[in-house]
Amino acid sequence: MLFFQQSDFLDRDNLPDFLNRRGLKGYGVEVGTHRGDYAKVILEKWEGRRLDCIDPWENSDAYKDQAVSLWGGARNREEDYDAAFKNLNGFGERVRLIRDYSPQAANKYQNNSLDFVYIDGDHKQVAVACDLWAWYPKLKTGGILAGHDIVCPGELPDKNWGKEIQPAVLEFCKMFNTTCYLIVESLCLPWSYYFIRS
């Protein structure tokens, strides 16, 4: 089986329109909301009822390691939470900010209850694998499990997250015998991906 195929749309900013076309307009989750920038894009375009934004917004050792890789140093996570609140406050009851770690948060949702989940949290391989396994059962049949930063190892040497995320996604594809659709974005690279729950 061919595990990776190119998506029929470009750029993750078009994911909300894709969800709308598929009639996925109920409940969604974003894991790793950070400052709320992508959650805002989702909420502006997606016709769904509510998006839960999950992020611990705390300075863990794992976060500090990623922060050095992404921004050259650690950031104040409380400032990130405040920015997310400011970015998303105008959406009212369509959004909830939930301070929690992803696998623990997933346990609070019923199986077969969500239309989509977008994963952009901890980029370490084991964490990505845990997120995929934790959230996949929460999707309705036909729901979308998507994520960010699957850039192929070596394509952007100064950004090391692809070497962690891609193996976790490939293993997940093999275990579920499913196709991963790659969403081409900037630099003609597949930054985002998604699965359709069968």
Please identify what each model-predicted range represents.
Residues 2, 6-8, 12-198:
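S-adenosylmethionine/decaboxylated-SAM
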